[in-house]
């Protein structure tokens, strides 16, 4: 169970013990066996010599650490306009990825068609910015198709936007499940979209 305690100034309270908490399940008090303080602010420990991610296995090992924050930037290309909206979103996101994260934060960029086994985490801010510059907005744009799945969408006619919304919801759900498999504790998905429309049953 993750707990964040702040004082009146919005500052973290770090000197609490398990006796300061009460956990209830169905109204019944539960015993607290352990309480662990985790400070994950993206700063690099003085003895941390493994900032560069060398492989997916190394990324998974780093992601499992309690003091490492994990972020996925989900670019919703189906609901971002091709021209000005995409340009503005890329500019804002490029600045964001180069300034918002700490040296130990793990960050990945993906879209609807990125399989979870192709998600790649990095700490290289320039690499992230380069990935962002390659992102495209495809709202209302159906050709060329990027995959066989998208080719099949073309036969849905007026229902194609609903199908795209369902694909978005399914991809988000798969990403949530994937992040949950990395470790206990908090992970973050940053959704970049103009609107995700009617998500359909996958969003329930």
Write out the residue ranges for each language-model feature.
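Scaffold/interface architecture of coatomer-like assemblies
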Residues: 1-204
């Amino acid at each position: 169970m993750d707990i964040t305690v702040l004082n009146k100034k919005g500052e973290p309270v770090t000197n609490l013990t398990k006796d300061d908490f009460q956990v209830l399940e169905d109204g019944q008090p539960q015993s607290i066996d352990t309480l662990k303080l985790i400070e994950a602010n993206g700063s690099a420990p003085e003895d941390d010599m493994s900032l560069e991610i060398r492989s997916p296995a190394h990324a998974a090992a780093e992601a499992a650490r309690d003091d490492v924050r994990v972020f996925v930037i989900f670019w919703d290309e189906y609901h971002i306009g091709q021209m000005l909206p995409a340009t503005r979103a890329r500019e804002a996101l490029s600045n964001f990825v180069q300034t918002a994260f700490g040296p130990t934060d793990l960050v990945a960029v993906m879209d609807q068609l990125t399989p979870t086994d192709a998600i790649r985490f990095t700490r290289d801010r320039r690499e992230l910015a380069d990935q962002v510059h390659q992102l495209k907005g495809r709202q209302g744009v159906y050709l060329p198709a990027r995959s066989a799945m998208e080719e099949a969408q073309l036969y849905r006619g007026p229902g194609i936007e609903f199908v795209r919304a369902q694909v978005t919801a399914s991809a988000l759900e798969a990403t949530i499940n994937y992040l949950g498999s990395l470790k206990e504790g908090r992970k973050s998905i940053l959704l970049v979209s103009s609107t995700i429309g009617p998500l359909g049953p996958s969003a329930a």
